[in-house]
Amino acid sequence: MTDVLTTASLISEESRATATPMMEQYIEIKANNPGSLLFYRMGDFYELFFDDAVEASRALGITLTKRGQHMGHDIPMCGVPVHAADDYLQKLILRGYRVAVCEQIEDPAEAKKRGSKSVVKRDVVRLVTPGTLTEEKLLSPTESNYLMALARIRGSAEAQFALAWIDISTGVFRLAETTLTRLLADIWRIDPRELIVADSLFHDEELRPVFDVLGRVAVPQPAILFDSAVAEGRIARYFNVSTLDGFGTFSRVEMAAAAAAVAYVEKTQIAERPPLGAPERESAASTLFIDPATRANLELVKTLSGDRDGSLLHALNRTVTGGGARLLAERLMSPLTDPERINARLDAVAYLIDDVSLCDGLRDALKHVADMPRALSRLALERGGPRDLGAIRQGLVSAEKIAVILDGGLLPDELAKALRDLKALPGALEAMLGSMLADDLPLLKRDGGFLREGANPELDEVRALRDQSRRVIAGLQLQYADETGIKSLKIKHNNVLGYFIEVTAGNADVMMATDEAKARFIHRQTMAGAMRFTTTELADLESRIANAAAEALTMELEAFERMVEAVVQQAEAIKAGALALAVIDVASSLAYLATEQAYCRPIVDASMTFSIKGGRHPVVEQALRRQSAGPFIANNCDLSAVNGGKNGAIWLLTGPNMGGKSTFLRQNALIAILAQIGSFVPAEAAHIGVVDRLFSRVGASDDLARGRSTFMVEMVETAAILNQATDRSLVILDEIGRGTATFDGLSIAWAAVEHLHEVNRCRGLFATHFHELTVLSEKLGRLSNATMRVKEWEGDVIFLHEVGPGAADRSYGIQVARLAGLPASVVERAREVLTKLEDADRKNPASQLIDDLPLFQIAVRREETRKAGPSKVEEALKSFNPDEMTPREALDALYALKKELGKA
């Protein structure tokens, strides 16, 4: 089946002209949904055909078969059962596929009325894409599921790019301006499952590196979706308002991104409209800038191998609700830069630490909170069931209990606002759902039985009739068994025959022994080992049961719709209450964590201070405790301004391999992040002057797919740091200059230290094995030497994992090599070579360089030139218009420029 018709050839005129009626319908629907696998409903299965079938069978690991021929080719086919469709959708979505779900929208009996060859009407009811999921099975309860739109407007004084992101499962809708420089960092911060972009922009070479990194997450869409001229009207129509003035002020490029996101939601949800919150604008300056390399190196929400276990988020997470877990992850990805907002969060955590019984009471109550935002979204999109209504009911009940627990004290601002939002939840809705819904709820509304007995007296009567009839059937079975003497006689039911009497083939003669018996027991079906009969009274009873059951279900479904309508009308209050519960969950979980792990409250302000006493690595410390491997060795770090200066310090860290340099670097970056999300930190004391940008170049990696070696990746990331770090930034660099010749590496590291000190003027930690760099501390006033301490004992090296002042004179690489198991002969030869190299170095010590080289003068001079603005020659060149000059005028101008350069 290798020769398969492609979608392009499938939708040709020749293809349609030769197709059967059913296949013609399929081709038409497929043509309207390019780029998506088409789940085509046929009875109890979703079928896929042609190249969709080949692709899906490979991705799902299901059998590929065929269904006839088309245009002389076999038609590949595979299918999945409707009842298990969510499981298969999940696999496809995880692999980055998009699926168009095509349902039968009329009863087959209606189609037959139009003629024997008529095809059942079908249409796509939904496009399932990674960024527009709502089903519980397809979503992680602890992770947001964002759809993002990227827009760009050229020739505008406004920011060139904007991002809008929506989680239709919770109603979150946010937008922000960005720049090309920070575009990828902002995308990674939000971590969308799907990013839509205008097709013209998708093929822009300037953005090719961004889309290469994103892979299948980025999806081109028609440029018309991003038209800023109609953006405001599109958003206003979605929210059913005449003006967006009540939402705030947005730039043109922000509106273009927001409108594209809304248009894509409408496109994928067909006729349904999820209850989105009003768009909220985020300022780039309000969050800590963390570039993609730093996020990966620090393993904030997942490890370098892609696992959640072992990440900072995994070490922090003590939340007990899905909403709380999502909010904690969101905060960790976007630390704040406003000390006032940070301290408001810290106040809430401190309040709950001080009142242990309150914290424990809240956490116990929060364990019963259901995921109201996601249940609300499914109900609004008509994908919800009775259990979603039950989730709203349970959430409202729990919220009321939590409000009672929290009420009564003088609460900090964050908890006080949460309490107000909980009190604003609709009590009448809670009472209505409590009185209507049964305790045990079915998954699907079509199963019925979700209304409480007593909620509707008329329904109770119909149910009694239905249930009584079923008891009558049990009585009939006993009666017929006695009449015939067949003890094994059973009354059964299926969707084809309805209720019927079944006896074994050996007992069938008794049922037809006399004319009277034949008249009473009417033969219906002969099976291999059994025969089936019915009676007039059984048929009458079946009719009554069917009517009663149908009537009961109709009444329940009508009540279901009324309850859904009541819930959706309170969508804003429910979402606000759910957010309040998430805020309380995060605050109480961080309080619990701080008590459990002995964290301290950091001082966070607008100063340039960076002082940590007894700091610890939050992830490594917990790992050591789990392994009973002894305590984590705490260390101090002080990068505060030196001698009353206004710029922070840089530590040059030397020491042995395995001494703990990388751990020390990372732990200080993580402590800064924890402080700025509003968490207590693993230290005895900490004072963090807000960091605006965090850069980390730790660990080695390559990018072979893009033709970049480990050294090239290191240089690219270092270049980004040196070009973007400000005086308020925190920079941690580990072993810059590896992977090239020794002198090349030393030179690069040397120049990088100078640049960080004199141009960036940032706070930083610079770990290196180039001990020659330690002499820089004699000339660079804010540079201090620090080292990882070790002890030597009888030829062995003992790593103390302690940081102290001073410089290491050795890296102990040979000792580490011996510990790793290198052959003894290799280790001994390495010692001999090292001795010779050290003797040579003593004859030309690096300390001479400090006097021979004009340290950092080039960097300073270039910085001064850049700040001074354009020269007279540059100004003159700007004023020239060559098209309007005669040859003589051009020559005179050239002489004038030469004269000006001579003066310079």
Curated annotation (Swiss-Prot):
GO terms for biological process: mismatch repair. Pfam families: MutS_I (PF01624), MutS_II (PF05188), MutS_III (PF05192), MutS_IV (PF05190), MutS_V (PF00488). InterPro entries: DNA_mismatch_repair_MutS (IPR005748), DNA_mismatch_repair_MutS-lik_N (IPR007695), DNA_mismatch_repair_MutS/MSH (IPR017261), DNA_mismatch_repair_MutS_C (IPR000432), DNA_mismatch_repair_MutS_clamp (IPR007861), DNA_mismatch_repair_MutS_core (IPR007696), DNA_mismatch_repair_MutS_N (IPR016151), DNA_mismatch_repair_MutS_sf (IPR036187). The keyword DNA damage applies. Keywords: ATP-binding, DNA damage, DNA repair, DNA-binding, Nucleotide-binding. GO terms for cellular component: cytosol. ATP binds at residues 655-662. The keyword NAD does not apply. GO terms for molecular function: ATP binding; ATP-dependent DNA damage sensor activity; damaged DNA binding; mismatched DNA binding. It comes from the Bacteria. HAMAP family: MutS. This protein is involved in the repair of mismatches in DNA. It is possible that it carries out the mismatch recognition step. This protein has a weak ATPase activity. Belongs to the DNA mismatch repair MutS family. This is DNA mismatch repair protein MutS. It comes from Agrobacterium fabrum (strain C58 / ATCC 33970). The gene is mutS.
